[in-house]
UniProtKB/Swiss-Prot annotation:
Entry protein name: Probable cytochrome P450 127A1
Keywords: Heme, Iron, Metal-binding, Monooxygenase, Oxidoreductase, Plasmid
Gene3D superfamilies reported for this sequence: Cytochrome P450
Biological function: Cytochromes P450 are a group of heme-thiolate monooxygenases. They oxidize a variety of structurally unrelated compounds, including steroids, fatty acids, and xenobiotics.
Annotated GO MF terms: heme binding; iron ion binding; monooxygenase activity; oxidoreductase activity, acting on paired donors, with incorporation or reduction of molecular oxygen
Length: 414
């Protein structure tokens, strides 16, 4: 399987300024453990970079299109990169490039000062008060899904039956969008993040058409919802352009859905394999807050990439203007210089300064909402479902990539 993936990923030549001693044939897409693997552990597979070799190295193929990147492995170095927006730019137009276009997903792909302007505009949507007001809905969505599962069966595919529909349902409620499109949106997001080039293009077109349709509808018929807020918003005394509305809509429709569902999936798989921890959290749900943070650390899912804006020497490494610089959270959060026994799950770990939601000015806008979804989802599951385990004869399938994921988690409590 991994050999097939290697053939599909193009490798670009190594730039002349990269010292041969800093080249490492490691990739979040093609290294061992990154291809879809039954009972895989991609997080342990990437944690091996801390065992030997330089703390910053050059990977000849570390993006979906086979582009080379510098890989920053230490947590403290990643924080420096993510804080320094002047030297390391976020502007890449990844989503638009799938359509052959060039516009930013907002505010994710903006740099200061524009980033700060748009982030301030959108902050009220993700305030603690607004998330708190949504908590009854989060509990209700989780409870209804789990009750339906428990009523009809003693086994389920937790991703298909719970994690994905739960996270999409909550986020659609958060955005004020109809639940009718949930299954279609799940398919679009899956194709965008994990599909081939053809599927990504088709999904991107569908998402853009959906956002444009919603924006046009809310311009004509305002409501109390996310899209009305966006089309009526003003920055620096002017209304947002159609491209800006689209850039915001794409980010908040796509970002956080697959990643939150994946976090719940990794958590469920861990608890299914560790019955003592499962029972502890079932009997003492007050521990779920710290436990969720530890599982976010251990099973982080996202690689963050920046582009160097100038030639620099960073920790003795010659980074040149235009170089891609990768900050994989799943590597930083297994850094032994940052976390004691990083490959051991400690559900009571204190001062857990992980970067599962990024770091610096681009810290995930929806981090608070995501945390509440994960904790409430686990709480409701443990309260309603008795001791569960991986069904005999089945195996969860994990994969690496730009976003790590897990599927085929067949749980049973018979």
């Amino acid at each position: 399987m991994s050999d097939l993936r290697r053939k599909r990923v193009k490798t670009n030549p190594i730039p002349d300024h990269v010292p041969p001693a800093l080249v490492r044939h490691f990739s979040l897409f093609t290294s061992p453990g990154m291809a879809p693997t039954p009972n895989g552990d991609p997080h342990a597979a990437v944690a091996c970079v801390h065992d030997d070799g330089p703390p910053i190295f050059y990977s000849p193929s570390n993006t979906r299109d086979g582009r080379g990147t510098w890989v920053i492995t230490r947590a403290r170095d990643q924080r420096r990169v993510l804080e320094d927006t002047e030297t390391f730019s976020s502007h890449r137009s990844i989503f638009a490039s799938a359509l052959g276009e060039h516009w930013p997903v907002i505010p994710l792909e903006l740099d200061p000062p524009a980033h700060g302007v748009f982030r301030a505009l959108l902050n009220p949507l993700f305030s603690s008060r607004r998330v708190l007001a949504l908590e009854p809905t989060i509990h209700a969505r989780a409870g209804a899904l789990i009750d339906c599962i428990a009523k009809e069966k003693t086994s389920c595919d937790v991703m298909k039956d719970f994690a994905l529909p739960f996270t999409f349902s909550v986020f659609l409620s958060f955005l004020g969008l109809s639940q009718r499109r949930s299954e279609v949106l799940v398919g679009w997001v899956s194709d965008l993040l994990h599909g081939n080039a053809e599927k990504r293009r088709a999904a991107a077109r569908s998402v853009v058409a959906f956002i444009d349709e919603m924006a046009a509808m809310r311009r004509k018929s305002p409501a109390v919802d996310f899209m009305t807020f966006v089309v009526q918003a003003k920055i620096e005394g002017r209304s947002l352009t159609e491209e800006e509305v689209r850039g915001i809509g794409v980010l908040f429709l796509v970002a956080g859905l697959d990643t939150v569902a994946a976090a719940i999936g990794f958590d469920m798989a861990y608890l299914a394999r560790n019955p003592k921890h499962q029972e502890l959290l079932r009997n003492e749900p007050a521990r779920l807050g710290l436990a969720a943070e530890e599982l976010l650390r251990a099973y982080s899912t996202v690689q963050i990439i920046r582009v160097a804006t100038k030639d620099i020497e960073f920790e003795g490494v010659p980074i040149r203007e235009g170089d891609y610089v990768s900050c994989p959270a799943m590597i930083a959060n297994r850094d032994p210089s940052e976390f004691k026994c990083p490959n051991t799950i400690d559900l009571a770990r204190q001062d857990n300064q992980h970067t599962a939601f990024g770091y610096g000015p681009h810290l995930c806008h929806g981090a608070h909402l995501a945390r509440r979804e994960i904790v409430i989802g686990l709480r409701e599951w443990l309260a309603r479902i008795p001791a569960f385990r991986i069904k005999e004869g089945t195996a969860p399938i994990t994969h690496g990539g730009h976003v790590f994921g897990i599927s085929n988690i067949i749980l049973t409590w018979a």
